[in-house]
Amino acid sequence: LGECEQYYKDRDFHFSRYEIALAYMALGGIPYYMDLLRNDRTLAENIDQIFFKNPQIKQEFEDVYMGLFSSSEKYVDIVVELGKHKYGMTRKEIADAVHTTSGGGLSTMLDNLQQSGIITTYPRLGGKRKVMVYQLVDFFSLFYLNYMHKHKTPTTGWGALQRSPQFFAWAGLTFEILVSQHIRQLQNALRIGTVTGMYNWRGMTDDGDGSQIDLVIEWHGERTDYLCEIKFSENVFAINADYKQALLDKISAFRESAQHIKSHSILLVMVTTMGVKRNVHSGCVNLEVTL
């Protein structure tokens, strides 16, 4: 993000950091698409021109995989399925979805996708055992699959879409991925030394509801677990009574889980686009990181 910010400054763009993040979430920092941006257009107008008014965009999506892999159709099938599951899929789930075996051929394709930076793997903890999950993290592919795959191209412009539930679902996921790709910067902001563990956590609250923590960072040197709630918002985010209770329930569920080392303290971190509004409910947040 820092490099993108400098790129825009050098070319006389005056995007806010919120817009720089949005551009990154759509274009993925790909130089080819960044070079198509014009500083006499708004970000919305630029995205309209690059994506929604570009009849070749489907071919460009397929060309990405044709240029990287032989048997590109099989790779595209995997990517399309992963695009339907925002928090990823296990190897068996992928094999079932693309109608193949969970053998060497699939392993090779998953390894190739991971080495190219299109997907990533991470441990999901909170159940009886650790599960490795494959997640699509290529921003261009996520944007294409969300808005244009199978003739989904919207008739309204990008500006209008930014008020839609579809936009906030896409933005919420891609902002989490954006944060995960800037872990070093997050560590620096939190003044964390050597990280001992980092993972997504799922568990159950006392009332039996499912609970998820977007990112857990373990720092054994300070005997502290940082529970990171990652929140995309176009404005300063206001925590209300219900949201505060949900956060406290997550902390309680994690504290009682097998993953939490009982001698460790817990710090709740809000990672947001625009910051957290100070109000009667925001005191539960121990640390805050913004763009």
Question: Model features per residue range: what roles?
Answer:
Residues 1-19:
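Conserved small helical "lid"/interfacial subdomain of P-loop NTPases
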